[in-house]
Amino acid sequence: MSKCAKRVLVFSDLHANKRALLDIAPVLKKVDLSIFCGDLLGYGNDIDYCINFVLENVDLIVLGDHERMAITHENLDGQLPEVRASTIYTRCKLSPKQKELLLSLPTEIWHENLYITHSINDEYLRNKEDFERLCEKMRGGTRYAFFGHTHEQVLYRHNERIVLNPGSITKGRRGFPRSYALIHGDNIEFVNLEGIF
């Protein structure tokens, strides 16, 4: 399987936070391919700015669970109070055009030797068994699987396949910093960001 010949930026879990997005905006100009692994919305108030910026400047974008909850009006009874509150707020703020644009986003992308998703059935993928399930979804020549959702950095190698979660550029969880990932050739680097939003 071929290595990644392009300079690739992988980031996830922006959650409508303009300040976090501005941290990586300069990086977008220095890469050949930019990938966003979902959760553009939720928690933050910078909905319009983040939707416009990501849709205009990022090459490959998948739908996250926070976008899906905001545009499909699914039942929120099982969600945490802060998730319910932010989803209801987001539903009120989205325009019909924005909802249409978000509805057009796929939940999975296969691009060259890459597989991109936010998660599998909204599960938190955190262990070897979870990562191997992602590998099972990878098609023939696919080498990389990128996902988000947990806000935690993951780099897992299995039979020449690589599973990567770049973490969250807004807020890390379980001791992880805010971060994104850069890939060039065989080099994979997590870039940690300062500050908590």
Label the model's feature ranges.
Residues L125-V191, G195:
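Conserved beta-sheet core of the metallophosphoesterase superfamily
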Residues D23-V27, Y49-N52, N75-G78, D130-F131, ...:
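Short, glycine/charged-enriched secondary-structure capping and boundary segments
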Residues V10-D13, S34-D39, Y43, L60-D65, ...:
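Active-site neighborhood of phospho(di)ester-bond hydrolases with catalytic His/Asp-centered motifs
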Residues A16-R19, C50-F53, N57-F146, T150-Q153:
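Conserved catalytic scaffold of divalent metal-dependent phosphoesterases
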Residues S2-L9, I109-I116, H158-V163, G185-I188:
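Beta-strand-turn-beta hairpins that frame and shape the catalytic cleft
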Residues M1-D59, D77:
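N-terminal active-site segment of His-dependent metallophosphoesterases
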Residues K29, V83-C92, E160-I162, G172:
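P-loop/Walker A phosphate-binding loop and immediately adjacent motor/lid segment at beta-alpha junctions
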Residues C4, K29-K30, L55-N57, E112, ...:
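Residue-level preference for short coil/turn positions at secondary-structure junctions
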